[in-house]
A protein has these predicted regions:
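Charged, low-complexity intrinsically disordered terminal regions and linker tails
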Residues: 1-35, 51, 63-137
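Short amphipathic alpha-helical segments
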Residues: 44-54
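Short, solvent-exposed secondary-structure capping/transition elements
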Residues: 43-45, 58-67
């Protein structure tokens, strides 16, 4: 099973990421996290939106956003273990040049920011009809 292989690959010690490491984003994206989670309650947690945004970016074929990320979203340990493992595995598979957990998390954050940009554009263009479940189809 290809999916099982990706999960196994993501769990290798080589891709170990300390659970107390901070997941970061840009100030503009942090405001959008706050909007969707704290104000609109579209997502229950920022870490749920984080992994969702990674998947949105990967599915859209978006390039990683390398802007400086200086605001915390959450700790790695807060993120659902299975969702995080899938995101790690997919990003590691797409970026074979990455060979350590620190660089992998940096790239995951870059993909999350790309996904947030896609979601923000959709949100701004859809007024009150924003439905992130459309990305699951």
């Amino acid at each position: 099973c290809k999916q099982g292989g990706i999960l196994k690959m993501a769990e290798q010690e080589f891709f170990s990421i300390n659970p107390s490491t901070h997941i970061r984003t840009t100030s503009e994206n942090r405001r959008f996290y706050d909007l969707l989670v704290d104000e609109k309650n579209i997502f229950s947690t920022k870490y749920q939106l984080y992994t969702f945004a990674i998947m949105v970016a990967l599915r859209a074929g978006a390039a990683p956003d390398s802007a400086t990320k200086n605001l915390d979203i959450c700790l790695v340990g807060n993120v659902d273990k299975d969702n995080f493992a899938v995101a790690k595995g997919l990003v590691a598979h797409l970026c074979p040049e990455i060979n350590n957990g620190s660089d992998l998390l940096k790239r995951m954050n870059e993909y999350a920011d790309s996904g947030i940009a896609i979601l923000r554009t959709d949100y701004e263009n859809s007024d009150e009809d924003f439905d992130p479940s459309a990305y699951l189809e």
